[in-house]
């Protein structure tokens, strides 16, 4: 049973509530009508307070001068007695004066108003006492006993303070005993706040629902929305959907949440991938013409920008303009940042020019700052418009009087590095120093990265060492870049050197550093060093990823280290990493080379059980293994199975394996048949295909076939390689044949009859 319902059923137990006059006027909002001038009212207050202070408290009742002041003061506003009570300075004096005033109340012209306001001041004093509970209860009982109506302020104070002291029942009693006409929005706000803070959500929403009715006499206001929305969201009392519905109900009364709360809620929705819901909320608020500011729109614009939804961003900005919501400096930043990231730099520059200088809702002018300029300069650099970026930097310094910073120059440096203009990038570093801007680690990483990308590893090392001398230290990114660059050119010794330097510099390696080292060591087949790096990786609290496992398994397979292969597979299983098709293909190739076809079959079966279909690489590895041991029948059987039972079609590599195998056996007919099948199935032969066929041909007996194949290569635009030329030079040794070979090299047909060779034609081959 709710508190409000239980209290409602106990109302008859309060005898005082049977007085209809008390019910009707238990509380009201005083609208004092000043009857004398403000200066005269102040004079009355000062005179009364001084007289009270001079007169001993036990003589107040008998003091004729005080009695006279009561009579004369009653001609003034009832507020006089509230002010007198406040200026007494303590609860004890305030309650004594109230009791004195009550005893003399027959002399007051506006008794109820005067006593109500004086009691309000006493309640204010009581609430600030160290232990106010009993005092507040006593004052409330006095109001009931003496039939003194409470002011709205006094009512709110009692409801709030009782609630804070955990006396929610008492708060509700105060509210319930009010006349319905006195339960205005201000009082209801306090009640709702107290109920929500004490977890009585249902009771709070009963009061709120009355306020949210269409024809409500006391509708919600901005304070109502602030109280309710703050509490329900902070305490997770409602779902997002119900909060959205609640905002809509407030919106129908022309009330919007405060800008800070609404911005946070919109941001939360966007974070939860609910940008459409955020859009609907703002649209509904705009439709009902509720007062709104730019920040909530900025939150949604940021979300749309992250998703590169520029079309909807444009629509939202237009809606803002329609309802006269002025964008601010944050709006400008969001728009130009998104446009620059999407490479629409011209539009970003246009927005920048249009919005600068406009006034915001708070009266400030949108002034471009270094962040805006940096965004535009970076955008121009990213699309290669370096000259315009430099011009904007000049304008930034001279026209706008906006000082560039390290970010500004780092953007330019990155632009020049992307364009391969490394010397110009270094010149920008010198300009930084001239402007008394110290290069930072981002500067170093940008140039080192640019130099490494453009094959300037040595240059990158020199630059980095120079920067270190100037006091700019590298970080993990710097060392990662150098290590990766060294590994990419198979200079693993240097990569290990930079790894050690990184440790000396106090930089903790991350997993990517270890992966780069493992990759480099696997490429140069240094298995022992790779194992040591794996151990270091695990000591650092990291684990191998699937790519690293595959590289290591491949390395150990090449080294014929079966023990380590199985160790890696066991480790993978412990780490919860499932083998992928690359893992299985590597293992199948390994077992195939060792003629362990039982393991090959087992691996293929395991592969299917893991939900992985054999790939063209899988079939290629097995077919190659069968061919390498002369099991061509098994190889052909698997080859045909590809076309019949799997979705994988043979590619050029698989055809070449078979053609090469048959050519080695001298079975040119079978090899040529496979080549013709390639043509029929639209699988393009390559130079390896023709080289295998050429090896099988004898110039004396199969000269025409040789020339036809050479013509096919020309027609297919298949470039011969060094092996092709060596085979053909051996097969075509006569002068006429050498002329044909020269024409073949030049891309001409050779099968048709040719003119007699010039004596110098032979030398043109050299």
Curated annotation (Swiss-Prot):
GO cellular component term of the entry, any: mitochondrion
Annotated localization: Mitochondrion
Keywords: Mitochondrion, Repeat, Transit peptide
Any Pfam family matching the protein: PPR_1
PPR repeats: 151-181, 184-218, 221-257, 258-292, 293-327, 328-358, 369-404, 405-439, 440-474, 475-509, 510-544, 545-579, 580-614, 615-650, 651-685, 686-720
Presequence positions on this chain: 1-30
InterPro entries the record matches: Mito_RNA-Proc/Resp, Pentatricopeptide_rpt, TPR-like_helical_dom_sf
NCBIfam families given in the database record: PPR
Family to which this protein belongs: Belongs to the PPR family. P subfamily.
Record protein name field: Pentatricopeptide repeat-containing protein At3g61520, mitochondrial
């Amino acid at each position: 049973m709710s508190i409000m319902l239980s209290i409602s059923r106990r109302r008859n137990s309060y005898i005082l509530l049977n007085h209809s006059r008390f019910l009707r006027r238990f509380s009201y909002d005083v609208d004092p009508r000043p009857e004398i001038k403000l200066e005269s009212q102040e004079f009355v207050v000062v005179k009364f307070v001084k007289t009270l202070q001079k007169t001993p408290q036990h003589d107040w009742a008998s003091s004729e001068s005080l009695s006279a002041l009561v009579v004369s003061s009653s001609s003034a506003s009832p507020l006089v007695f509230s002010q007198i009570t406040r200026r007494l300075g303590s609860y004890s004096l305030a309650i004594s004066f109230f009791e004195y005033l009550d005893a003399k109340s027959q002399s007051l012209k506006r008794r109820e108003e005067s006593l109500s306001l004086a009691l309000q001041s006493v309640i204010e004093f009581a609430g600030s006492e160290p232990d106010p509970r009993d005092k507040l209860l006593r004052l409330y009982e006095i109001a009931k006993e003496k039939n003194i109506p409470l002011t709205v302020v006094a009512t709110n104070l009692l409801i709030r303070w009782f609630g804070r002291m955990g006396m929610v029942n008492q708060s509700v009693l105060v509210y319930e005993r009010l006349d319905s006409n006195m339960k205005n929005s201000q009082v209801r706000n306090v009640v709702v706040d107290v109920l929500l803070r004490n977890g009585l959500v249902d009771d709070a929403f009963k009061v709120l629902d009355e306020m949210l009715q269409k024809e409500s006499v006391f509708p919600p206001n901005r304070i109502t929305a602030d109280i309710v929305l703050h509490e329900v969201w902070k305490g997770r009392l409602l779902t997002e959907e119900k909060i959205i519905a609640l905002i809509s109900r407030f919106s129908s009364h022309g009330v919007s949440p405060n800008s800070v709360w609404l911005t946070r809620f919109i941001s939360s929705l966007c974070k939860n991938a609910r940008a459409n819901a955020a859009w609907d909320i703002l649209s509904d608020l705009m439709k009902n013409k509720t007062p709104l500011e730019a920040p909530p729109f900025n939150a949604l614009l940021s979300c749309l920008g992250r998703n590169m939804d520029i079309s909807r961003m444009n629509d939202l900005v237009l809606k803002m303009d329609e309802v006269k919501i002025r964008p601010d400096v944050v709006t400008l930043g969001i728009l130009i940042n998104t446009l620059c990231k999407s490479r629409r730099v011209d539009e970003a520059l246009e927005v920048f020019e249009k919005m600068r200088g406009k006034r915001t809702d708070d009266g400030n002018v949108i002034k471009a700052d270094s962040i805006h300029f940096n965004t535009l300069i970076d955008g121009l650099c990213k699309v290669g418009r370096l000259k315009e970026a430099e011009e904007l930097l000049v304008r930034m310094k001279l026209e706008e009087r906006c000082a560039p910073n390290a970010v500004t120059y780092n953007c330019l440096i990155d632009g020049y590095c992307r364009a391969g203009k490394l010397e110009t990038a270094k010149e920008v570093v010198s300009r930084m120093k001239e402007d008394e801007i110290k290069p930072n680690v981002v500067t170093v990483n940008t140039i080192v990265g640019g130099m490494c990308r453009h094959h300037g590893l040595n240059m990158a090392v020199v630059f980095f060492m120079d920067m270190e001398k100037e006091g700019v230290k590298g970080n993990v990114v710097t060392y990662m870049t150098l290590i990766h660059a060294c590994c990419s050119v198979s200079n693993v010794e240097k990569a290990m050197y930079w790894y050690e330097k990184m440790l000396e510099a106090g930089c903790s390696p991350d997993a990517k550093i270890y992966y780069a080292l493992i990759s480099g060591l696997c490429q140069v087949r240094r298995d022992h060093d790779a194992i040591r790096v794996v151990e270091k990786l695990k000591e650092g609290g990291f684990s191998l990823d699937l790519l690293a496992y595959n590289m290591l398994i491949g390395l150990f397979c090449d080294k014929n280290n079966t023990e380590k292969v199985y160790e890696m597979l066991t480790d993978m299983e412990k780490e919860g990493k499932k083998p992928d098709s690359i893992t299985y293909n590597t293992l199948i190739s390994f077992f195939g080379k060792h003629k362990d076809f039982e393991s090959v079959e087992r691996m293929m079966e395991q592969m299917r059980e893991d939900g992985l279909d054999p790939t063209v690489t899988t079939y290629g590895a097995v077919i190659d293994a069968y061919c390498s041991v002369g099991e061509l029948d098994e190889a052909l059987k698997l080859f045909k199975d590809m076309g019949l039972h799997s979705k994988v079609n043979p590619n050029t590599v698989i055809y070449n394996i078979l053609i090469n195998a048959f050519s080695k056996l001298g079975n040119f007919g079978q090899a040529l048949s496979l080549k013709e099948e390639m043509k029929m199935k639209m699988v393009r032969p390559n130079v390896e295909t023709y080289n295998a066929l050429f090896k099988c041909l004898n110039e004396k007996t199969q000269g025409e076939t040789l020339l036809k194949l050479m013509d096919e290569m020309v027609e297919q635009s298949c470039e011969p390689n060094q092996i092709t030329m060596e085979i053909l030079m051996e097969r075509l040794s006569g002068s006429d044949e050498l002329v044909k070979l020269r024409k073949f090299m030049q891309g001409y047909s050779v099968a048709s009859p040719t003119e007699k060779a010039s004596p110098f034609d032979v030398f043109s081959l050299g």
